[in-house]
Amino acid sequence: MARLSGVERPDDSGLRERKARAVEEPVKQPVESADGAAAAAQAKKKTIGRTPDGTAFTVPHTRDMVSQLLSPSEPKNLSDILVLSIIGLHIVLLYLLPSFLRIPIFAVLFLSWRAAYNIGIGWLLHMQSNHSTMVLWARQTKIFVNPATGDNPHPQLYSFIKRELETKIPEDYSFEDAPIEYNTWLVFRRVVDLILMCDFTSYCLFAIACGSRPAEENFLVLILRWVVGLGLVLFNLWVKLDAHRVVKDFAWYWGDFFYLVDQELTFDGVFEMAPHPMYSVGYAGYYGISLMAASYKVLFISILAHAAQFAFLVLVENPHIEKTYNAPPPRKRTIESHAGLAGEEKSSRRPSDSSEMVPPPSPVALPSSTHNLVGVKNLDLHRITDSSIILIQVLFFALTMLTPSTPIYQFFFVLNAAIWRLWYSVGIGYILNCQSHRREWTRHFVKFGETKEEAWNQWKGTYHLSMTLCYASFIAAAWKMYTLPENWGYGLAILKHVLGAGLIALQIWTSVSIYDSLGEFGWFFGDFFFDEAPKLTYSGIYRFLNNPERVLGLAGVWGAALITSSRAMIFLALLSHTLGIAFIQLVERPHMQKLYGRGLRQDAGLVRSIKRSLPPSFKQLHGSVDRILDESIEFIEEVLDTARPKLAAGVTTFVKDTSELFHKYPARITITRIEPDLAGYDMNDYSINVDTSDCITIRDGAEDKSEVLVFEYGSPIKVNWTAPLNHSKRDWVGLYMIGQNPSREVTNVSSWGRWVATNHGSFDSVLSEKGLIASDVVVSKPGTSNTSKKPSVKSGSGKKSSTSTSSHEVASGQMVFSGDKLWWTQGVFEFRYHHNGKHNVMATSRPFEIRIPKFDDGQIPSHVSSNGNGFMTTAIEQALLPIVQNCFDRDPEISPQTAEEPFGCETEGDLKYAKRVVYAVHQMFGIEFATEVVRADGNVQNLAWRICNAKKVLAPYSMRKSNGASTPTGESEEMK
């Protein structure tokens, strides 16, 4: 049975998996009669949409793309005629082109439309999700503003769009009254219609151009090929229709990138069968068409298009879903007692999902997940498990490459793979079975005075090493048994390699999905070692399958057997699959039934969908087969219980992960845009000054002649600027490290998102206005002014050809740099004022320093280190709290107000707050922690306790000075 973990909740695993339920908020209408009551009841079924600013509106009913374009009963407008005309041109082109040009031309056409889909639409949606770019374009161009107001510079375009949209939506829609977000989405829909229809049309025409019948094909194979191909196409059609039935046009056209609807997330139909059905099984028709065309060209271009669609899903849709629907839960304002926390831990199967962990000195119910084992990113050569695996992999590789592929060596490699598979399934299964019944693994370590956490860590190492050796030996055997085809065009050589690679990719994806759903705890069968009142969840791949590893999790071994076409590899694949199923039935299933009882789900989503479509006679047959299997399994278990040998296995628990230096040296290759003519701008009117109200001013130099502005790490920095009244509305201010830009007149290094616009609505990104406080406030500037107009910039001032002592008016503004717009590292920085969206520097600020104060051990009484840690811990808490608050952007929703208050939650993929804290702790105390440690500690009090103990362990090395040049990230991460 599946190792399940966590608390059950909906799995929002696909953008187009959101079904709109009738909203309970009625549209207010007077009800004066029976007709009025019926109208009110109908109003309750209306879908209510909400824009990002909270505006509520009734979402009109719209028709799907195919019905709009092809149904004669649907009204047609100019955009429909345009789409149909372009489709018709594609068809005409197929018949006009000579035969030798059809395939390359339509291959280019299809790839162009596919790029417009995945890259073009993907970029638009990415920008809309993060910056509301399309809505900002609509606001800037004012295309939805009524021309009667005199503010619309495009009245003809307004009339055209209004006519186009109102023709398509006759009910519940008013172009003038609809929110700008909804109108923008409707225009975006028309662009999507054009791209999707041309994408599919060009693909079908390419398949027609490539279609042929192999010369050696007999009639039976021809019939079979077309029957299977048509079946896949019809299945694809059903998937698309059922998906549209569930999600409607709102999710089909990515509506929640523009607005949200008042609805619940529900899953039924095709969304119970497979994850992301629109992008997984929803592309089965591509392979059906490839089969009917009997063309490898169509197959390969189908695989390429399918891979591009998955990239679109991963890079565009999934991040938006996480941000929109899987926001972290609200933070608890007061920390709970240890007992309450322990109880909460007992009810959670995924300790890594909670940041409110028990303080380090207290015992925990479930193991800490601060130092995971699975994955390349968790590779730690200081651990003997990881170093042993690397050495063994090198040994396997050397033996495989250096030995000949003679029959005797092939035999030994296959035998080695079979032995490791037996150990991985039978040996590991025996250990887990003993652990389930008698806790033998844990008892062994307790006997020698170890804890069950130590037993758990040793078990993880044993299982991880066994799994790695099992698959390494299998790959080595496959390599020995494989021979390159002499003629790739003969027989099914290419097809076997393609299908085999697909099966291997399927197993890799399944394993990654299982790990994402279970976490480290479930992956290593944690409920065999910690069984305190667990709860089940069926998220991720487990929403569709109870035991994905039973079939999909072993697809790769059959892929290797298919590629090698070797009887020995078929034997290994059969052995692996048989032992894998036996492991599930004889080890996992009994333990899960004992632990969870009736809490186990009988049928997964895919099984439920299939059962609903079966006639009653088949359902009865299925029940009889299940009973026979259950009785057979019980008999086998009784036989095994009567004779079970005892095995003893133990593994002892060796160069630190390489630190990422990407952000230490930012990219210096950028495209610098220069404004060629700056005539008409008085350079003396440009200035930029740092607000010194929050800075720490210290004397610089022995003679104390100058002052250095010093800001605390992470504290917001206010900037005041002035510019001529005629300055460009697209001016902007960027934050840079001193020394990055050799020129004072031109900036040639990217700001990495650390910039703020001087005016609202000037750039296609809402983030550009984040931090903007005031702009274009007219003030009087006393003193001299430059009348020459000739630009010359040096440190914020220009050359003067003539002067005047009279004051004059200038524009001024204020902005604040905070959060992701700071550098989050120590160093000396400056602000630069740029002109008209380009990189001409009009003014620079005074340099200032970002500094993290070192914790002074000298302020701790000498007796503390020997008699106790209480005073030192308190001192560390007091020094650390304000820095941690800065690291959390001083946001009251996530930033702790006291040392005991827990940190706010952040998503698994975004650990920026924890990385900031890690960097600050490293610079303050000379101690480097992993981000997982910060998340596990959960508050300043626990973190201070850990720092205090680390200082004792590492003394006198804990205060080694760092150069402070690196950014506070353990992984490459671009600051937005």
UniProtKB/Swiss-Prot annotation:
The chain crosses the membrane at residues 81-101, 105-125, 191-211, 219-239, 273-293, 296-316, 389-409, 411-431, 465-485, 488-508, 568-588. Its EC number is 2.1.1.17. Residues 1-80, 126-190, 240-272, 317-388, 432-464, 509-567 are lumenal. GO terms for biological process: methylation; phosphatidylcholine biosynthetic process. GO terms for cellular component: endoplasmic reticulum membrane. InterPro entries: Phopholipid_MeTrfase, Phosphatid-EA_MeTrfase_fun. It is found in: Endoplasmic reticulum membrane. GO terms for molecular function: phosphatidylethanolamine N-methyltransferase activity. Residues 787-807 have a biased composition (Low complexity). Keywords: Endoplasmic reticulum, Lipid biosynthesis, Lipid metabolism, Membrane, Methyltransferase, Phospholipid biosynthesis, Phospholipid metabolism, S-adenosyl-L-methionine, Transferase, Transmembrane, Transmembrane helix. Residues 1-36, 326-366, 780-810 are annotated as: Disordered. The keyword Glycoprotein does not apply. The keyword Oxidoreductase does not apply. It is a multi-pass membrane protein. It comes from the Eukaryota. Pfam families: PEMT. Residues 1-27, 343-353 have a biased composition (Basic and acidic residues). Pathway: Phospholipid metabolism; phosphatidylcholine biosynthesis. It catalyses: a 1,2-diacyl-sn-glycero-3-phosphoethanolamine + S-adenosyl-L-methionine = a 1,2-diacyl-sn-glycero-3-phospho-N-methylethanolamine + S-adenosyl-L-homocysteine + H(+). Residues 102-104, 212-218, 294-295, 410, 486-487, 589-976 are cytoplasmic. Belongs to the class VI-like SAM-binding methyltransferase superfamily. CHO2 family. Catalyzes the first step of the methylation pathway of phosphatidylcholine biosynthesis, the SAM-dependent methylation of phosphatidylethanolamine (PE) to phosphatidylmonomethylethanolamine (PMME). This is Phosphatidylethanolamine N-methyltransferase. It comes from Trichophyton verrucosum (strain HKI 0517).
